[in-house]
Amino acid sequence: MVTTVDSVSERGTVREVLAGANNAALRELSDFVARWGCSSVSPFHAEPGLTMVDLCGRGVVGYAAIRKWAVLPADVVTIPGQQEEALAMLLDHLRQVGRRPVFTAVTSQQPYERAGCYTHRIADDPMIDPANFSLDGRRMSSVRHSVASARRSGLRVVPWTQALNAAITGVSEEWLRTKRGGEMGFTLGRLDHFDPATVDCRAAIDGNGHIVGFTTWRSYQNGHARVLDIMRRTVDAPNPTMDLLIADSLSTFAASGVRQVSLGSVPISHGPLGERVYPTVSLRRYKEKFAPTWQPLWLVAPSRVLFPAALRAVAHAFCPDGILSAVRRNP
């Protein structure tokens, strides 16, 4: 069953679509996001369960409806040269349907500030050029030693195949049993949303042929960019498992035409309670091992006055079961 909501202004007709994963209209908008999305967070506009918005062919977004808020993952995805026009259309549309916008992580403040919005630095994106990625040099010594140790222990990396599905699911379920609050969502991927057509999954196999960990990478920029999404391993996996998975992927991406890689944005730390919801300090330290270039991301709210309410809406999008459930993940 497909639900559409249209709004009409002097700029044209804007269409909302909320549908099942097999709906043709939704697939068309998801394809637009995959082709034109330039931000590492842009693939999450097409997450299952989000309302997708067609901005007269100029742009596409997805949003989570949280009370009166439209919580958007990232920048408006547009064809070149149409960002400000598409943004104006989106803001007009959301006013007409009675929703306030909050953009969770955008790459540039200027278009939103020109539209009268308030911006606040919320995260940093660790970017890597795969063409220049190497394990050589002092800065990469920790990863280099981990990869050597992993290979000595018999670990190897293989791409996803249907035959590995059950084992990968088993690894994920074991990992989730260590997280009492379960999976989060929104711009944090869920394995039950895994689509091999749009997600690159790689698994680590030990010397006995057992899968002990895996990563997933989302595609954007028309297939020329990747963003690290899910990282999971078994409790008894060798310590260097994840280092091997990431380093092996980074070493092979350039040969397959990938020009840009994100290790996944890391929120700015907000103190001890925030760390219990999402452990940003340790995650930032881990990703720094791969020598990325950190680029700032900004949260956009309608105004400074509405910023606290916008943050609460974003928190609800990530933790639909409530912040307390997320806190229980990391006691």
Regions found by a protein language model. Give the residues of each.
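A structural motif corresponding to the C-terminal end of an alpha-helix
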Residues: 290-291
